[in-house]
């Protein structure tokens, strides 16, 4: 649940991290990057007045990290030895750490994740770019869209630890990715840009982790970018005031300079709690022939814990974002038999038990049974292993499973053993499906078939579980699909992935939010009915009232930009200011009550433009309120074009209708007859334009004589055009380019 307005709550004064760590280990900023996590040497402590090192600003030396006295050795097994992974033994839960990296947009999550992977030897120094951004659209846009995980092996004081890192998106449209990642984690690294401080999504992620009872490790990032102590002090104060996290708990890092990474890894091992799972032999159906009541039999029964795992992501080889099994070395040809593009790859967190290849697992909701073809970890590509045990995060490969037979958030389990019955299997709690807030029609490009588009969408939905799909049929555009998304950016990214990964060019109708209505004579307790342009009901047709979704939008911006943003919110986007709070000398927090339709229409883009990119926005779940809504229909030569119908407030119907018919007039080709363009609300015309016909000068050869000769020619021409118009009713063809231009006018 989005909780951007939670900044107004009183500070939560409590110690969120149960494990303690030396304050001098946390609060001292080290301006050197000389030590490496694979080295047994630690960096020497720098004096407070020393200004040497890779960071140029001497004022940063107020915040230093003194390296831990614990030492870290080389990771094992080596990341380039495939045989070591195939024989990977189970890790005890006490030596496993699962954590997610969460933060506001562009606060350094992916850069820090890559720095951790490079410091631990998972990535080599020769590899460039952000490794966890695998999708083409992620690299083009420069943002994280899909959460990515990677297993890291670290040896500390002779003990080997398995760290499972999950890098998450920061944009509000991808909160579902963050929610799933936190459900599979035991802790969250809460990153805050040292220069920008607390932002709206920072608080949303903080409360999301807090609601799940996760340990929170606050981390200030981009320490190399600040030029004085003032922004760091302000960020620390914001953390204390807004979250209750103590200053001495804060870690300082510079992923760009590879500084503070080793101290961060030490803190993860010391402060992140190990998973609480039971090891077991999940696929064991019969006990060995041991004497009843013997200690050996009792010990074996204790190990017979059935498998219980959380499925928190899935993909196929066709839409896996470049995640593949590493190529064999030395020209070896390896064929595991599990490389079929139609196979389903699921990312799972093992709660209890053990998962091995050939284990038959059951999906809790659908009761579908499937055999695991392969299990393994991501390090950083797919690495098959002998087993996944309690507390581990890895992948499992199934033969092709249809999308309706499972959903992300599903609990996987094995058949009951002698000790555990079916009713003892409890689904993994704390995970819920989200409802889409923006809907749009997707139609295949001219010359393409709906079957190919439907297959591409179904394959991509395996990796995008928040997208909903329903069939559509439009006389002007043909067969299509109505898809539901979590926001405008989510819709744009999905459209780009269809083109990049499946080559599908589509025409997208204007996005609409989910309106609802209450039937006449129904009780207040009865559920509301969904309202779309295809299921529209007027009041005289049985609708008692219409309801529109409203959200509470929280904006954090600089004080000099507040007036411009406030003016636009109230004037163009039907916003109602709820409250405003001054955070510090430079920033303010303001909350608006606003229709979700106006928010999706481009409010965030306007806020970013007016604030020069320095504002952040978050909004919560929609709440439905009664509204005066109408449906605007567009008629071209008296034929209704359903693709251009739109639901809007009654007060905005004339302006929206005017924009649509004006766009059609400027793009339609003139013909031999007039083409009337009308926008109607019910039976009332609210806007009209006419595409004038070509007119032949029938009096060109008449140079003299009475005027009645010209009038006769004009009357004959008029009668002929009337006969032609009667024969060509509905014959106007609208190309997709014309419809796309008219649809764009709706969103202005």
Curated annotation (Swiss-Prot):
The reaction(s) catalysed by this protein are: GTP + H2O = GDP + phosphate + H(+)
For this protein, the record's Pfam families field holds: EFG_C, GTP_EFTU, LepA_C
**Transit peptide where, by residue?**
1-29
Q: Which UniProt keywords apply?
A: GTP-binding, Hydrolase, Membrane, Mitochondrion, Mitochondrion inner membrane, Nucleotide-binding, Protein biosynthesis, Transit peptide
Please tell me where this protein is predominantly located. mitochondrion
This entry's Enzyme Commission designation comes to: 3.6.5.-
Any Gene Ontology biological process: positive regulation of translation
State the annotated membrane topology for this chain.
Peripheral membrane protein
Any single Gene Ontology cellular-component annotation? mitochondrial matrix
Span of domain tr-type G: 94-276
InterPro entries (alphabetical): EF-4, EFG_III/V, EFG_V-like, LepA_C_sf, LepA_CTD, LepA_IV, P-loop_NTPase, Small_GTP-bd
- Quote the HAMAP family the UniProt record gives: LepA (MF_00071)
Q: What does this protein do?
A: Promotes mitochondrial protein synthesis. May act as a fidelity factor of the translation reaction, by catalyzing a one-codon backward translocation of tRNAs on improperly translocated ribosomes. Binds to mitochondrial ribosomes in a GTP-dependent manner.
Family in the record: Belongs to the TRAFAC class translation factor GTPase superfamily. Classic translation factor GTPase family. LepA subfamily.
Q: What protein name does the entry list? A: Translation factor GUF1 homolog 1, mitochondrial
Which organism is this protein's natural source?
A: Trypanosoma cruzi (strain CL Brener)
């Amino acid at each position: 649940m989005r909780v951007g307005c939670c900044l107004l709550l009183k500070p939560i004064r409590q110690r969120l991290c149960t494990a303690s760590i030396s304050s001098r280990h946390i609060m001292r900023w080290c301006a050197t990057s000389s030590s490496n996590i694979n080295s047994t040497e630690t960096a020497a402590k720098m004096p407070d007045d020393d200004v040497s090192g890779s960071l140029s600003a001497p004022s940063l030396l107020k915040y230093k990290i003194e390296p831990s006295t614990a030492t870290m050795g080389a990771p094992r097994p080596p990341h380039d030895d495939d045989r070591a992974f195939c024989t990977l033994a189970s890790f005890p839960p006490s030596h496993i750490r699962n954590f997610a990296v969460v933060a506001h947009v562009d606060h350094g999550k992916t850069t820090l994740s890559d720095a951790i992977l490079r410091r631990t030897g998972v990535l080599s120094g020769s590899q460039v770019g952000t490794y966890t951004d695998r999708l083409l659209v992620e690299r083009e846009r420069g943002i994280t869209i899909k959460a990515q995980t990677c297993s890291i092996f670290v040896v500390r004081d002779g003990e080997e630890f398995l760290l499972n890192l999950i890098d998450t998106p920061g944009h509000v449209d991808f909160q579902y990715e963050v929610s799933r990642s936190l459900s599979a984690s035991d802790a969250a690294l809460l990153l805050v840009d040292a220069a920008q401080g607390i932002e709206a999504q920072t608080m949303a992620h903080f409360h999301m982790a807090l609601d799940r009872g996760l340990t929170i490790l606050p981390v200030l990032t981009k320490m190399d970018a600040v030029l004085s102590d003032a922004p760091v002090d302000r960020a620390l104060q914001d953390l204390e005031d807004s979250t209750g996290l103590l200053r001495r708990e804060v870690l300082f890092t510079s992923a760009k300079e590879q500084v503070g990474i080793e101290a961060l890894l030490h803190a993860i091992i010391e402060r992140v709690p190990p998973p609480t799972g039971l090891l077991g032999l999940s696929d064991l159906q019969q006990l060995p022939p041991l004497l009843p009541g013997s200690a050996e039999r009792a010990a074996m029964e204790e190990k017979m814990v059935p498998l219980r795992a959380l499925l928190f992501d899935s993909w196929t080889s066709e839409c896996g974002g470049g995640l593949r099994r590493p190529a064999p070395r030395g020209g070896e040809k390896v064929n595991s038999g599990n490389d079929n593009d139609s196979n389903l790859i699921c990312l799972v967190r093992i709660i209890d038990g053990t998962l091995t290849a050939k284990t038959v697992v059951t999906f809790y909701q659908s009761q579908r049974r499937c055999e695991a073809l392969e299990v393994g970890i991501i390090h950083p590509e797919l690495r098959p292993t002998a087993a996944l045990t309690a507390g581990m995060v890895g992948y499992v490969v199934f033969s092709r499973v249809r999308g309706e037979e499972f959903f992300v958030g599903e609990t996987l389990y094995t058949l009951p053993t002698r000790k555990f019955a079916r009713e003892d299997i409890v689904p993994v709690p704390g995970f819920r499906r989200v409802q889409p807030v923006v809907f749009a029609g997707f139609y295949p490009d001219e010359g393409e078939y709906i079957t190919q588009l439907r297959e591409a969408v179904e394959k991509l939905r395996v990796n995008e579980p928040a997208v909903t799909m329903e069939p559509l049929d439009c006389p002007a555009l043909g067969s299509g699909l109505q898809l539901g998304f979590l926001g405008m950016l989510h819709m744009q990214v999905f459209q780009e992935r269809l083109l990049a990964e499946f080559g599908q060019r589509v025409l997208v109708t204007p996005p609409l939010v989910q309106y609802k209505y209450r039937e006449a004579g129904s009780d207040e307790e009865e559920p509301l009915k969904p309202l779309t342009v295809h299921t529209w009901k007027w009041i005289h047709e049985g609708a008692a009232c219409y309801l529109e979704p409203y959200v509470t939008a929280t904006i954090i911006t600089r004080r000099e930009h507040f007036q411009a943003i406030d003016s636009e919110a109230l004037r163009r986007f039907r916003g109602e200011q709820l409250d405003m709070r001054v955070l510090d000398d430079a920033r303010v927090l303001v909350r608006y009550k606003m229709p979700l339709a106006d928010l999706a229409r481009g409010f965030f883009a306007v806020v970013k433009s007016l604030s020069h990119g320095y504002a952040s926005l978050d909004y919560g779940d929609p709440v439905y309120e009664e509204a005066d809504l109408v449906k605007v229909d567009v008629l071209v030569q008296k034929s209704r074009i359903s693709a251009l119908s739109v639901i809007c407030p009654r007060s905005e119907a004339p302006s929206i209708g005017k924009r649509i018919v004006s766009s059609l007039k400027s793009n339609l080709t003139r013909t031999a007859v007039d083409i009337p363009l009308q926008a109607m609300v019910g039976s009332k015309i609210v806007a009209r334009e006419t595409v004038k016909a070509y007119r032949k000068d029938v009096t060109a050869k008449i140079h003299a004589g009475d005027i009645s000769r010209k009038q006769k020619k004009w009357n004959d021409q008029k009668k002929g055009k009337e006969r032609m118009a009667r024969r060509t009713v509905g014959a106007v063809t609208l190309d997709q380019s014309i419809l796309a231009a008219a649809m764009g006018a709706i969103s202005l």
